[in-house]
Every structure is written in structure tokens, then in C-alpha cells.
Regions:
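N-terminal, positively charged nucleic-acid-binding surface of large information/translation enzymes
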Residues: 1-182
């Protein structure tokens, strides 16, 4: 049986799900159902990224710990999919023909990511170094040099100067193999 991998964008549970969340998941669900009808073994995933400054600030504003805050918001996403008639199973459960919902704070997910990063670092594909730049918490993105030195070039909110240690993946090491493959 042919395999088909499909994923929605990963959602940030700093607020309730919205029409954009519903739209992208419904479109992917339609495609997953179609591919199953065509005989594909479909792996259909979605989930929440439960880390970051935006989450910490939203939790603090709500008077909750980040873990309490995201647990409540995660349930809203799952309920939305159920209301839309999309069969969903929350990680690590995996029901056949369902949308697998994975969240980044699940201990199994954290262990898997740690194993992957350790292996990549051992092979020289990940290194740790200091990064300095302007960051927009609202958009959760670093801002390119050469734009407004004070505000985010997308939302217009003030950007923060950030200096921190980060891990960098050497994607350039895979450029030629990827070009050869595709």
C-alpha cells in the first residue's frame, strides 16, 4: 500500500483556536479522506507547539503556569476537531484513520526530539552558538536586518533585542543530496 504523509500547520495555543485553525485542518482532513479512498495508508498529523515566549506571557496574563494554560487550550483544539466531525486521537494513542494530535510538551515527544538532536549533534549537523537579533514575540519570529530598527515589519509592534544561545541545524550540508533527490 502506498503511503501518504499529511500535516497541518502546528498551532500555538496562546489563545483559542480560530477560523484559520479550522480551515487548514478541514482542508487537510478532506485530502486525507480522499487519499484513503484512493487506497493510500495516510499518516495525518496536527498538534500544538507549547513552548515559547508568547505562551509564557499569555499564561502569566491568565494567572496560570504555562503547563496549566496550554493543557486547557489544547483541549479546545481537540474539541474543535471533534465538533467538525474529524476523528482525532491524542498522542501517544493512534487510532486508524484518525487525525493524530501531538503536543510538544508530551514526555514521549520531548524524549524523541532529544534523541534526534543528540544524534544530529554527534554527526556534526547541529551546533550551539550565540544569536543576536530583533525578535517579535507576537509573530514569534526574528526580524530581518535592513528593516525598521524598532518595530516588527509585519505587525508593527515593538521588536525586542534578543541575545541568546541557540542550536543551529546545518541545512546546507543537505543541499546537494536534496537537490539530487528532488
Amino acid at each position: 500500500m502506498k503511503k501518504f504523509y499529511l500535516t497541518t500547520p502546528i498551532y500555538y495555543p496562546n489563545a483559542r483556536p480560530h477560523v484559520g485553525s479550522a480551515y487548514t485542518t478541514v482542508v487537510c482532513d478532506v485530502l486525507a479522506r480522499y487519499k484513503r479512498m484512493c487506497g493510500y495508508d495516510v499518516a495525518f498529523l496536527t498538534g500544538t507547539d507549547e513552548h515559547g515566549e508568547k505562551i509564557e506571557r499569555a499564561a502569566a496574563a491568565a494567572g496560570q503556569s504555562p503547563s496549566q494554560f496550554v493543557a486547557e487550550k489544547r483541549k479546545l483544539f481537540v474539541r474543535l476537531w471533534e465538533k467538525l466531525g474529524i476523528p482525532v486521537s491524542v498522542y501517544p494513542e493512534g487510532k486508524p484513520d484518525s487525525l493524530r494530535f501531538i503536543y510538544t510538551t508530551h514526555p514521549d515527544h520531548e524524549k524523541s526530539v532529544q534523541r534526534l538532536l543528540v544524534r544530529a549533534r554527534e554527526r556534526g549537523f547541529v551546533d550551539k552558538r550565540r544569536y543576536e537579533g530583533r525578535y517579535c514575540v507576537s509573530d514569534e519570529r526574528y526580524i530581518s536586518e535592513g528593516t525598521d530598527p524598532v518595530n516588527c515589519d509585519i505587525c508593527g509592534r515593538p521588536a525586542e533585542l534578543v541575545s541568546e544561545e541557540n542550536y543551529f541545524f546545518k541545512l546546507s550540508a543537505f543541499q546537494q543530496p536534496l537537490l539530487d533527490y528532488y
